[in-house]
């Protein structure tokens, strides 16, 4: 289904930051300024979402691993729901450093988590005391909170989608150091970097409604 300008406006995806907080590098995507708020051109958002959708479809066709990364606490639960719905890997809490540049080490942590999760279903786990079981489950819960969205990830992601480019600046540094990894950056008008035209979505990232609309449009 094609996206219309009305869809963008209804989702409030076109609303940017205050003009004083917006970065000059983003003003080519603006439609103007209203009440001191940078307003993003809905046509630009439509084109960017369509570009992202094509990139995702191409990655799926080649069975590439897709990962969405976000540290926005307000959107953690929704991202988990979307990850399960569309079958993509996700990190929705604290992002481990070196996830791309030191993936083999992180992969071992994921494998360890999966081993721990399997152990809970064994007789050996049942043979533990109630206190030992409780301690073990608490330890597993801490690991799952960070890594459960990537429990099926067996190789370095080949397409990474970043929610809030400015907030995830350190992770974007990792992306720039791993040229074999494709990216889609979803950012607001405060984004301070230049990025490839076919790999960025400049939109409202501070609204549940807007983010839901963007991600569902990308994957549906």
Where are these regions (language model features)?
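Short glycine/threonine-rich loop/turn motifs
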Residues: 171-220
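Short hydrophobic alpha-helical runs that function as membrane-insertion/retention elements
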Residues: 65-69, 89-92, 161, 182-187
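N-terminal, positively charged regions that mediate nucleic acid binding
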Residues: 1-65
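Long, charge-dense
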Residues: 77-139
